[in-house]
């Protein structure tokens, strides 16, 4: 059974190109290493109807997990909790545990719980808050028809804190799958020359091989070759990746290429 | 009339988190500065059916432009042209102009046009190739029911070359809109304290204001305040952004905050 995942990142700054979406790649990498297959990453604006409708679309594809990032803060344009509630046809309610966390973070410093601060404890009905150790706004999770939805703040270190806490303690189903990859660099072989050989090895072994061009195809051919596989037995997965790597290296040598610095030998 | 845009980035490396999607932010920034409103950025795997189905979804939302990046190369997993053709119910055909470009790039160097190399000239029926000045695989464009689709390679400098060539010479409809933003940094005011004031100014002026937290809400409040607006008259747009900036700065001073280094005065 495939454990699929989707990532939804919310924030106008992603759509104007102001912010590079490093949250998406952090989350994708973390989920991949846990054995999830990330199928789609979507970035949308801070808009209520848009958030609600994309949440519905994603749930229609029934992933095992959806990680949502951004829009949990105190400002007028933070509307992820409300958007998720709307997408699920649930009410937005004051969550007592989240409220306790906010009280602790503001009131113990003598700061009043204004309307903007209280807003961060308004979660979709049935959601469980996830403590934010690196900032204020709590994350939250809820399971809908077998899909774990987890919402994290957009500030990177807060996203990481909430995501790790979720993955380590609250994940409903953990994939029984191990993912492994290795890469190496090749000089002097064009991507289009290596292509038919790689196609043959992929077809025969089922291992994923991708060439990432780094130089210029004809004038200065320089490629990174990535080999990735996943399976239940970590030792077996590593062994398969390494044996395929040796086969590709042998082909590169036959084609007159040279192996550059190996990144993860 | 709103000129909406979508971006579709294709490549397994984006979904495993191996590659940070800097192409998406480059394209988003370029389109935003031209006056487009980027509504959605999607990243998916190199999978034929997935590409075809996402292309259909995007066209169903009728954006003015869709920029697709990645998957135009010579390898077995480069299948963007075929996926777009399938999504449009068009045939994939050998394009004579693209073939001429490949002949020039390979045969003039004494390199044969193998099957893998010829594949890069197979484009959806009716597509116009866009010369790739920075690499081999040509980009292409086609207009479907008023939506400009433009496909670029995934290697960043090749994407930039093809995209610029498209935007400067082949774009069907150019938005008559100018976008402008300024930012400044604030110390000593919590985001939740500034929030109600900003909400009021946004409501009154229609100007977009976003606070980006950079420090820690209660222990070391530090915010970047971004002010953005767009309209037909560049001078008027700048004037509005600057006057709103002064209003927000005045509020910050009243709240006891200090203005840090101004980024674009």
Swiss-Prot record, chains A, B:
Transmembrane segments: none annotated. Pfam families: MoCF_biosynth (PF00994). SMART domains: MoCF_biosynth (SM00852). It comes from the Archaea. Belongs to the CinA family. This is Protein Msed_2121. It comes from Metallosphaera sedula (strain ATCC 51363 / DSM 5348 / JCM 9185 / NBRC 15509 / TH2). The lineage of its organism: Archaea, Thermoproteota, Thermoprotei, Sulfolobales, Sulfolobaceae.
